[in-house]
Amino acid sequence: MTQGAQRLVSMRALLESGAHFGHQTKRWNPKMRPYIFTARNGIHIIDLQKTITGLTEAYQFIVETVAAGQKVLFVGTKKQAQETIAEEATRAGQFYVTQRWLGGTLTNFATMRKRLRYLNDLEDQRARGEFNKLTKAEALKLDAEIEKLNKVFGGMKTMDRLPGALFIVDPHKEALAVKEANKTGIPVVAMVDTNCDPDLIDYVIPCNDDAIRSIRLIAAKIADAAIEGQNRRESLQADVHGAGYEQEMTAQLIAREAEAVE
């Protein structure tokens, strides 16, 4: 285990979150064999050394992705993941899906973008007071439409292009999201339990994807990575702007000195 990996997450934190508990042995996917430590009382126990390694690699990838100016789409529609995914994605300034994954979200993004723009337009109209010009029934109908659209698209209504990566809780449940990401060439980072197929995932974080504490721990680390990536990007942009300013000042100084000589 590297020093950096130890700093990112401790074995104790993983154990306390229950990240090591897999599914019943009879429900396993044999492809997960390399990530399984042992079996106890009919339950597979995940090798947490592999969890730390996977999380560390995923963390670095997310940092680099966001630093390059791309966004991450967090996906977790199972009940125990919804609140955490929305909170952590929002904290990191990223996008999220916590309701049903709609087919075509990635593979038919042109249509998806139109629906997102429609939602934004409706909200803009309401903010400008245009609903006040309508009948009460018409205004209520549009309010209901906004509420309905926000429930489905609220976590990604400012997403104007495809994300640079997906972070998924339970790729077995989110099979359609994984399929669309694979088809569009978008890398997938995922919490992968013992019943999942790791071959479909670019960055496998083997762990319990059902326990709330495990989901909170891993999702928070991915959000931290996105924040670090954004900070790195802003720092780089500041350096570039600073260098440009210095070059401009130097040029002006040289010009003034040249004028003085003349």
Swiss-Prot record:
InterPro entries in alphabetical order: Ribosomal_uS2 (IPR001865), Ribosomal_uS2_bac/mit/plastid (IPR005706), Ribosomal_uS2_CS (IPR018130), Ribosomal_uS2_flav_dom_sf (IPR023591)
GO terms classed as biological process: translation
GO cellular component, as recorded: cytosolic small ribosomal subunit
UniProt keyword annotations, A-Z: Ribonucleoprotein, Ribosomal protein
Record-linked SUPFAM superfamilies: Ribosomal protein S2
Gene: rpsB
Gene Ontology MF term list: structural constituent of ribosome
Annotated family: Belongs to the universal ribosomal protein uS2 family.
Protein's UniProt name: Small ribosomal subunit protein uS2
